[in-house]
């Protein structure tokens, strides 16, 4: 345990808190326009073609967002809403696109966890 003199000479420093979703600027969601929609491969040991989009946000940030669910209708110039939340096996993907909002359609034939994928209740 340090002495009072040691603490006066070299005070304790609080650890720096890094923001995991800086482009959100403390907002729960942000709107943006897709500049590129493409697929990418995950880190080892996983293997797939994950659907992602590069998005220019209203605050000027350019981020990569993951498109969840099976199938999507996004293309260049689609207006999307994003939320925070990274994809563990895709480096650099820190945001999720919200399905069923703005130009993004919900997932077709979704029976369970519908609210997460913007799917309406089946009749």
From Swiss-Prot:
Entry GO MF terms: rRNA binding; structural constituent of ribosome; tRNA binding
SUPFAM superfamilies the UniProt entry points to: Nucleic acid-binding proteins (SSF50249)
* Gene3D superfamilies given in the database record: Nucleic acid-binding proteins
Q: Which positions does the record annotate as the modified residue 3-methylthioaspartic acid?
A: 89
Question: Per UniProt, which keywords does this protein have?
Answer: Methylation, Ribonucleoprotein, Ribosomal protein, RNA-binding, rRNA-binding, tRNA-binding
Q: Name one GO biological process term.
A: translation
Q: Which PROSITE patterns match?
A: RIBOSOMAL_S12
Read off the InterPro entries from this record: NA-bd_OB-fold, Ribosomal_uS12, Ribosomal_uS12_bac
A Gene Ontology cellular component where this protein is annotated is:
small ribosomal subunit
Stated role: With S4 and S5 plays an important role in translational accuracy.
The subunit structure is: Part of the 30S ribosomal subunit. Contacts proteins S8 and S17. May interact with IF1 in the 30S initiation complex.
Family per similarity comment = Belongs to the universal ribosomal protein uS12 family.
User: Protein name, please?
Assistant: Small ribosomal subunit protein uS12
Q: Which organism is it from?
A: Mesorhizobium japonicum (strain LMG 29417 / CECT 9101 / MAFF 303099) (Mesorhizobium loti (strain MAFF 303099))
What gene does this protein come from?
A: rpsL
């Amino acid at each position: 345990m340090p002495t009072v003199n040691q603490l006066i000479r070299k005070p304790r420093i609080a650890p720096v808190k890094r923001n995991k979703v800086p482009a959100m600027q403390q907002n729960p969601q942000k709107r943006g326009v897709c500049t590129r929609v493409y697929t990418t491969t995950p880190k080892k040991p996983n293997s797939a073609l994950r659907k992602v989009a590069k998005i220019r946000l209203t605050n000027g940030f350019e981020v990569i967002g993951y498109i969840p669910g099976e199938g999507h209708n996004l293309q260049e110039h689609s207006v999307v809403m994003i939320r925070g939340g990274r994809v563990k096996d895709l480096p650099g993907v820190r945001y999720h696109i919200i399905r069923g909002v703005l130009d993004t359609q919900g997932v077709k034939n979704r029976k369970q966890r519908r609210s997460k994928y913007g799917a309406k209740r089946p009749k």
